[in-house]
Amino acid sequence: MPSFRTLLSALLACTFLHTLAAADELTKLTFGVVPQQSASKLANKWSPILKRISEETGIQISFATAPSIPLFEKKLSEGDYDLAYMNPLHYTFYSQSPGYVAIAKQANKKIRGIIVAQKDAKITSLDDLDNTSMAFPAPLSFAATVLPRAELKGQDIQIKPHYVKSHDSVYRSIAMGLYPAGGGIERTFDLVEPETKSQLKILWKTKGYTPHAIAAHPRISASQRRQIQSALLNLNNSEEGRELLSALQFSGIDSASDADWNDVRALNYSVK
């Protein structure tokens, strides 16, 4: 029969290990959002969701973004964000290094890239874009840049890309007549201000792919990932939660695993 001293030693060891595990869990986390739109617009849409998740988990989660998509990519590569909402191509890169782990994604959604043009412009097909300049958010914007440019290249349509840092900047620059056309995605096109959207038309759409990932940096413990994932999924279960999601044009949130983005990996895209 174990002696009292042995039992006491075991109890102290368990307590010590539990204390170490608790110390490893962070109480303040940053949630980085890809800057497809202005920081103020993104903060208005995401901060109420993060507040709700913070209240449910007891973990303080604060909104963060970057001035441009390339700077956001740099922060992801350096692991600056504890949690992040990133495009599908970003996820395939940054799940490798620094090792972000997918926990959730938009429900009932496939992301599609679009090419938009001025509504009154005499552009009716992709062929009309040959030898023009086009606006795109950033080189690694998956659906808004990579997919449209691949299609144009496949049709031997020569264009000169100009990177204007965000989706909203693409739409506004086309509406202002700075470019005849540019790349975006359906969700951000639907969210752009009506006075801009009314001047644009969708010229072409890509096929659908797994949408953006909500992912956690590997320094976030598995138990905290489960807590945050559960809180995200719980948004589906209340009217208030569904209203918060609707501000993002989300019909709901699904759990996610790394393999969900194998359709994007199958494109074998690499940065040249």
Residue ranges and their predicted role:
Residues 24-90:
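Extracytoplasmic small-molecule ligand-binding "clamshell" domains
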Residues 121-122, 131-223:
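Pocket-lining segment of extracytoplasmic ligand-binding domains
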Residues 92-117:
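Glycine/small-residue-rich loop that forms an oxyanion/phosphate-binding "nest" at active or ligand-binding sites
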Residues 29-36, 42, 127-144:
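Short loop->beta-strand "edge-of-pocket" segments that line small-molecule binding or catalytic clefts
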Residues 9-18:
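Bacterial N-terminal signal peptides
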Residues 1-8:
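Bacterial N-terminal signal peptides that target proteins for export
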Residues 27-36, 42, 108-117, 195-236, ...:
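Periplasmic-binding protein-like
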Residues 70-84, 97-98, 127, 168-183, ...:
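Short helices/loops that flank or line small-molecule/ion binding pockets
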